[in-house]
Amino acid sequence: MVTSNVVGWFLFSLCQLLVLVLSSGDGLAQAGSIKHSPSDVVKRYVELDHKGARLDAMSAETVASYTGWNEEPAWGHVVVTRGFVVAEQYRQWEVIDRLEVIIPVTFQVIGSVYLETAGFVQQVETEEVRFRVKGVKNRWKIVEPMLPPHVGQKRMVNFVREALVKETDPTKRERLGVLQEELRKAKE
């Protein structure tokens, strides 16, 4: 026997879900829909990468829907950045045809972390990467380039801190501590 409280709760929950769906508009639209700008796909991919989404296998799946490749190689290093700018206006792009464009992204790079040695090489530069985006099955997909993770400085410091907490080997802990300090002090 179903009580009126259960039915009331169910209807209330259903109404909340309906309000959420109706109020979200484009929020529930398929990521990378061809109806939206291809720069939206590039911007979202680069934002997620900046936040460290490609640093581990579990979170790397969040960016996979934006790319034309299924797997990435095991990168030996991570590019550490201060920020990035995506060219959002079509006049700044190279338009190949209706379903293919090249969108430039400018990164403010401060250096690279080499994962095997836990070493940081500071190399301040502005890097321009040209993302080729194609319309594939009614979705925009980044088809090239496949580049190493470009992670923000703060996120990289936190990533190293997490590794330091988990590490049990005293020598590796010391090296991670040095790396964390180098990353904190890195300047433009």
What are these regions (language model features)?
Residues M1-W9:
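N-terminal secretory signal peptides that target proteins for export/translocation
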Residues W9-S23:
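Bacterial N-terminal signal peptides
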Residues C15, L99, N138-R139:
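Beta-strand-connecting loop/turn residues
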Residues G25-A29:
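Sec/Tat signal peptide C-region and signal peptidase I cleavage site
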Residues Q30-G83, P170-E174, V178-E188:
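Core segments of small alpha/beta cavity-forming domains
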Residues S33, E72-T126, G177-E188:
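Surface-exposed, charged secondary-structure patches
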Residues I34, P38, V42, V46, ...:
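Low-complexity, intrinsically disordered terminal/linker segments enriched in charged
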